[in-house]
Amino acid sequence: MTGPAAAPVPDAPASLDVSGLAFAYPDGHQALFGVDFCVARGERVALLGPNGAGKTTLVLHLNGILTGGTGTVTVAGLPVDKRNMAEIRRRVGIVFQDPDDQLFMPTVREDVAFGPAAAGVKGAELEACVDRALTLVGMAEFKDRPPHHLSFGQRRRVAVATVLAMEPEILVLDEPSSNLDPASRRELADILRSLDVTVLMVTHDLPYALELCPRALILSDGAIAADGPTAALLSDDDLMRAHRLELPFGFDPRSVRASG
């Protein structure tokens, strides 16, 4: 799973296809209103939007944590439904904002091994799987360390490794740059660029989205309000204002060479 980021493969099934997805919570709050989008294999796509737009609700549908709405979600051609749930949860790896939500074992190695071991991987194959995932995120030398002895940035990289160990079709990242110092932020960006995996990145960090994702979706009031090149969307002042998105003071997306 190393090497340059894969180019989209036009003849392969889309990594992610969301069609007509609508969802209301039991209290009657309608969070999603007919969401439609498709992510090709190998794409890196940012999911942007203000608080309350429905981003978390959408993400929780991608691997079946939330169900019961209308519309469909498919991952590499496989519908997200009860029959396919085990395989869907292998194919869709979600890295949560707080790595401590994913790291709960005594050592880094045990955390990364947990998913594959639960899926029946054993022995030398399991060790190779752990080593491969930790190498991808530059954390192989820390595999015998307790996670709570690591820095926040290192724990986030280990959290990514726990997902990569399952060899997912798509990596979903929730606010990956939050609480990272500049060096850790840069290191994580380099890692994400190197992965041969489809990426959907949920973030309020618009410069990071521009740096890593050639394409962006804006989710606003439970619907896709815009879908296009990240640089173009961030340069559209009217669009940004309409959906309560703000760039850092002095940051001009037109002056930045976006990630390819």
UniProtKB/Swiss-Prot annotation:
Entry's localization field: Cell membrane
UniProt KW Nucleotide-binding keyword: yes
Residues annotated as binding ATP: G49, P50, N51, G52, A53, G54, K55, T56
A Pfam family the protein falls into: ABC_tran
CC annotations in GO: ATP-binding cassette (ABC) transporter complex
Family stated for the protein in its record: Belongs to the ABC transporter superfamily.
Protein's recorded name: Putative ABC transporter ATP-binding protein SCO3161
